Curated annotation (Swiss-Prot):
Signal peptide: none annotated. GO terms for biological process: metabolite repair; nicotinamide nucleotide metabolic process. In the N-terminal section; belongs to the NnrE/AIBP family. In the C-terminal section; belongs to the NnrD/CARKD family. ADP binds at residues 421-425, 440-449. Residues 58-62, 131-137 are annotated as: NADPHX 1. PROSITE patterns: YJEF_C_3 (PS51383), YJEF_N (PS51385). It comes from Thermanaerovibrio acidaminovorans (strain ATCC 49978 / DSM 6589 / Su883). K(+) binds at N59, D127, T164. Residues 228-512 are annotated as: ADP-dependent (S)-NAD(P)H-hydrate dehydratase. This is Bifunctional NAD(P)H-hydrate repair enzyme Nnr. (6S)-NADPHX 2 binds at G335, D450. Gene3D superfamilies: 3.40.1190.20, YjeF N-terminal domain. It catalyses: (6S)-NADHX + ADP = AMP + phosphate + NADH + H(+); (6S)-NADPHX + ADP = AMP + phosphate + NADPH + H(+); (6R)-NADHX = (6S)-NADHX; (6R)-NADPHX = (6S)-NADPHX.
Length: 512
């Protein structure tokens, strides 16, 4: 099933709703901490010292509840607290722990060597420093404890709600941060845990209840949906007896230039392996006889080009008059180059085509230079990697890498549908935001993005212009990389192999 995640402010509002229902905040904290302690005990059965790092807020209060329940089970527990002035439910949790004979050390009164010795002798550490309670850079005693933890401790680590050092909504690094083996999150997963870099620091995620039914206090619509291979069975492409090529839909690929002839054919291969009924590959006329035999299953359409071998705006007239009313999805940009002819063609298509359009590769660079025409009528999906996204947003690749949710939201607000490629690719249109938890570094090879653009085109042609179709395509592409890696192809793969493997994944959906 998909992972439905919520922004921290929505979960805080859910807590308030539970209180309005008559469940006191202290009871919610007790339920959450007790459930987390059960998960921790069942998973680790700690026989040595357990060190629980408690921050100043409610996450620290959760930590005190966990400490008490682990102590009740017989664990040797020491709490290292950054606060000497707790209030409210957090203070009550500390008082109950102390009343049971619990041991608390104020971090400000313990030297670095003493903290290091305490952590170095632990068999388990629980991070209850901040959870989702920080939006700024980690500092003070919290930063000090995290730095000492990273220097001196290498054993299992459990985070409560979110690993310290990462934003609960965006997953952005807040400076120094912990890497958990297990994150016990309360009521529902937090959105930030779905995005890198936080995703790579969460470890296994377990959701613990707080004593109220989630459906009564959380919004009906999640802020972020995480999808992966297990969800493919719910996204199957339509197929029935008597289905023909027309039912499967036509994908038209428009690309190629004097320098890059193979890219559009890789997109055509992706579309075919992604299940399209027909694929038309429109390329500069000089490339048609050279590359056409590489993908004989596609129909190659020679198109007008200039003296450099780049497509011109007249290419749209040819493809529109030949196939316009039959095209269900258009893929534009692979290998197109960035010359004046290509730029004119992109502007022409954006202004003329009123169906689904997947804009990729050089088409994105042209879009960054010229902007989206005011008269654009197409249903646009852009598929940038982080460098192309940076060009479209007028920022740096580093910013995009470090702020993937913010980048995807900015792109979607400007251009419509977006697939921000990379670790945990982000799919977004309107307010619907999905994160695809599938993929492998072996996918970072030339032509991989061209193949993905074709698979997206095929999924849209089969399922319609819906976010689910795009998510399915991105999952297929990601799982193809994972399957190749598991078969010994963790490096040195070819883009065409990704397409072929995606077809095998697609064909095996009945086994999901």
């Amino acid at each position: 099933m998909p992972i439905v995640a919520y922004d921290p402010d929505k979960v805080r509002e859910a807590d308030r709703a539970a209180v309005r229902m008559g469940v006191p905040g202290g009871i919610l904290m007790e339920n959450a901490g007790a459930a987390a302690a059960s998960v921790i005990w069942d998973r680790f059965r700690p026989t040595g010292r357990v060190v629980i790092l408690c921050g100043p807020g409610n996450n620290g209060g959760d930590g005190f509840v966990v400490a008490r329940h682990l102590m009740i089970r017989g664990a040797e527990v020491v709490v290292l607290s950054t606060s000497v002035d707790r209030r409210g439910d957090s203070k009550a949790a500390e008082d109950m722990y102390l009343a049971c004979g619990g041991r608390v050390l104020a971090s400000s009164e313990v030297s670095d060597p003493e903290v290091s010795d305490l952590l170095g002798g632990a068999c388990l550490v629980v991070d209850a420093l901040l959870g989702t309670g920080s939006g700024g850079e980690i500092r003070g005693q919290v930063a000090r404890l995290v730095e000492l933890l990273l220097e001196t401790y290498s054993g299992p680590l459990v985070a409560l709600d979110m690993p310290t050092g990462f934003h609960g909504r965006t997953g952005v690094s807040l400076g120094v941060g912990v890497r958990a083996d297990l994150t016990v999150t309360f009521l529902a997963p937090k959105s930030g845990a779905m995005f890198t870099p936080a995703f790579d620091h969460v470890g296994e995620m377990v959701v613990s209840p707080i004593g109220v039914p989630p459906r009564l206090v959380l919004p009906q619509r999640a802020d972020v949906v995480g999808v992966g291979y297990e969800d493919l069975s719910h996204m199957r492409l339509p197929m029935w007896p008597g289905q023909n090529k027309s039912h499967r839909g036509m994908v038209a690929v428009l690309g190629g230039s004097g320098m890059f002839g193979g890219a559009p054919f890789l997109s055509a291969m992706g579309a075919l392996c992604g299940g399209a009924g027909w694929v038309v590959c429109g390329v500069p006329s000089q490339w048609a006889p050279t590359y056409g035999h590489l993908v004989p299953e596609s129909m190659v359409l020679p198109l007008p080009s200039d003296g450099r071998g780049d497509l011109t705006s007249e290419a749209w007239d040819v493809i529109a008059s030949s196939y316009g009313d039959r095209i269900r999805c258009l893929v534009l940009g692979p290998g197109m180059g960035r010359g004046e002819g290509a730029s004119s063609l992109v502007r022409r298509v954006l202004s003329s085509w009123d169906g689904p359009l997947v804009l990729d590769a050089d088409g994105l660079r042209i879009l960054a230079d010229t902007g989206l025409p005011r008269e654009a009528r197409c249903s646009l999906w852009i598929t940038p990697h982080e460098g192309e996204a940076a060009c479209l947003l007028g920022t740096s690749s580093r910013w995009v890498v470090e702020n993937r949710r913010d980048a995807a939201e900015a792109l979607a607000s400007r251009f419509g549908g977006v697939v921000l490629k990379g670790r945990n690719s982000v799919v977004m249109r309107g307010e619907a935001l999905s994160v695809v938890c599938a993929g492998h570094p072996n996918l970072s090879v030339p032509g991989s993005g061209d193949v993905l653009a074709g698979i997206i085109g095929a999924s849209i042609a089969r399922m319609g212009d819906v976010e689910e179709a795009v998510c399915l395509a991105v999952i297929l592409h990601g799982v193809a990389g994972e399957r190749l890696a598991s078969s010994g192809r963790a490096d040195g793969i070819l883009a065409r192999e990704i397409a072929h493997q995606a077809a095998l994944v697609l064909g095996g959906l009945g086994d999901v």
